[in-house]
Each structure stands twice: as C-alpha cells, then as structure tokens.
Amino acid sequence: MESEFQQHHFLLHDHQHQRPRNSGLIRYQSAPSSYFSSFGESIEEFLDRPTSPETERILSGFLQTTDTSDNVDSFLHHTFNSDGTEKKPPEVKTEDEDAEIPVTATATAMEVVVSGDGEISVNPEVSIGYVASVSRNKRPREKDDRTPVNNLARHNSSPAGLFSSIDVETAYAAVMKSMGGFGGSNVMSTSNTEASSLTPRSKLLPPTSRAMSPISEVDVKPGFSSRLPPRTLSGGFNRSFGNEGSASSKLTALARTQSGGLDQYKTKDEDSASRRPPLAHHMSLPKSLSDIEQLLSDSIPCKIRAKRGCATHPRSIAERVRRTKISERMRKLQDLVPNMDTQTNTADMLDLAVQYIKDLQEQVKALEESRARCRCSSA
C-alpha cells in the first residue's frame, strides 16, 4: 500500500515538472484527477480484504465486555492461555444474533466508563483506519433496572472511597519524613504500638486498590497514633511540639547562653522573676529607669535617618543655620519698625527698615543742631 502511495507521489511530482510554464490556466500544487481515481481503487481493494483471525479475536474479546462488568480485576487483568489464545468468558444466551457492528481494522481506542454504583463498561471508539464489519452476538439486557451509565471516563483513576480516608496529618507526616525528620522519631516509634487496635476496620482500603501503594490514615486523638509501621513514621513530626513544658525549658536554656552580660539588668524581685512566661525575652529593655540610663550610656548612638528636607551635609547644615538667624533678626526688625506688614517679603522689609533708620538719623541731626544753637539764660 505504501509503495503505491509513493509511486503516485513520484508520478505527480514528474507531472508537475513536465507541464508547460506558459499555459493559460495553471493548477498550482494540485494533483491530477487520475491520481485520485487510482487512489479510490486502492481503497476499495483494501476494504474488500478480510481481516486476520487474530484481529477479530482480540476485537471480539473487547466488545464482549462492553455491557456488563461485575469486577474491575476481571477487566484489567485480561487472562490468556499459554498458547496465546484468550480464555473464553462464560456464555450468555442472546436474543439477536449475527448483529453486524463496524469496528476498526487497524487500531481501537477504549473508553472506560464508571457509573455511580460501581459499574464499568468499555466503549471502543473507531480510530484512524479503515472500517471492517465483524459479526458478534449481541448481549441481552439485564432484567434488573440499573442506573444509566455515566459518559464521563475515569482513566487511571482511584476508587471512589479512597480520598475520603486520607488525612491531612498523614500527608504532613510524609512530607516531614521526606525533609529528614522534625525531631519526633522517638514519639512516633512508641505511639505506633497501639496503632492496630485504634484504627477501625471500616476505614481500610477497598480490595480494588490493592495494586496501588497504600495510603495511611491517622486518627486525630490526644496520643498520636497511626497504623503505619515505625519505619514509616520515624521521621515524622512531633505532636508535643506545642507543649510549653519542653519548649520553655529549651528556650530558657537558650536565653541563658545568649544573654551573657545582661545579668545586671535582672530585677531584684525574685517572685516576679520566677513567674515569667515560658518565652524569655532576654533581649528586652530593663524595667527600672536607672538600668535604662546605664544601658543608654554604654550604648553607641546610631545614625538616625534625616527627616524629609533636612540634609546632613555640613554645607547644608550651615546654610540652614544662616537662614534661621536671618529669620530671627527679621522678626526683631519687624518689632522695631512701625507699620511693617508681616506678609511683605524680606527685600521690601529691609528697604523699609533702611528708610526708617535714615529718617531717624535726620531727626537726631536736627535735634543736635537745635541744641547747639540753644542758649539758656542765666537767672
């Protein structure tokens, strides 16, 4: 078949190169009509060809499991004899015989449909290929009324009751184990001895999921227990991590080692020191004012970030001081010069002050001259 396709391809390629270039109507990159006619004849020859017995046997085995399937394992683990022949399923009486059903001769794609009550059916879909007719016996309908089969396919999915038994703490314990443990291996090992008695039998996994890896279940109880073996939970987390007794002792020891020379800031009240919370604030400030002053005297002042608009450069600081002095002197000048508007700018204020000073100087000069000319008569 492939050789015929290649031959037609070469003929088409030669035909396109041998056509005259200056013809009126040119069929660009199109095949001649003779090519498609010969192609149809080759398809008819293939359709008339009967399928092999091995293909018919495999297809009939798939189609017989379409309507009813009581067990998932009977479908997944399809058994064959030692000589390669399929083990025949139990015979069932049929009503309509020799029903012609078109199936694929090359390949089929199976669709596994799982209904709500656990029924599983297989629907072979016709894939790319040529269609051949295969006769099979039609399965009779069952007498009991079952729910309609759902069209949603669940490929490689887990059983319906699997995810309801998964516990968040189990997944967390597995993650902690993969991270190398969280310091709770001893507690896990001792608590696993009572796991088998505390785990209910009703939560065990269904038999259809035995091929998958088992997922453990953890009962939420004060004493952490699980039915996993000790080696599985050896790296799990410790349930007593939030216990204030062990945590406070560790934090207190850590505070003692890190505090160092801060013992001088301890208060004199022994009762209040004994009633401290579990978390020791060893880096907190002392409570008394004298201790705070001593701490501030020993500490080195750190650089504080300048406010917005306040630069820390020496020239900027000098300019800011100069402007501050000018502002103070202008306020004094406003007090000395009468009828000076405070909203006037600095230049106008200076002009008014200069004019006022000149007027004062003229008045002083006139008074001095009048005093010099004045003669007091002696009595």
From Swiss-Prot:
The keyword tRNA processing does not apply. It comes from the Eukaryota. It is found in: Nucleus. GO terms for cellular component: nucleus. PANTHER family: TRANSCRIPTION FACTOR BHLH122 (PTHR16223:SF279), TRANSCRIPTION FACTOR BHLH83-RELATED (PTHR16223). Residues 1-17, 84-93, 265-274 have a biased composition (Basic and acidic residues). Residues 1-21, 79-98, 133-156, 190-286 are annotated as: Disordered. One of its GO terms (biological process) is regulation of stomatal opening. Keywords: DNA-binding, Nucleus, Phosphoprotein, Transcription, Transcription regulation. The modification Phosphoserine is found at S74, S213, S234. Homodimer. PROSITE patterns: BHLH. Coiled coil: none annotated. Residues 310-360 form the bHLH domain. InterPro entries: bHLH95_bHLH (IPR045239), bHLH_dom (IPR011598), HLH_DNA-bd_sf (IPR036638), IND-like (IPR045843). The gene is BHLH122. Residues 190-200, 235-261 have a biased composition (Polar residues). One of its GO terms (molecular function) is cis-regulatory region sequence-specific DNA binding. This is Transcription factor bHLH122.
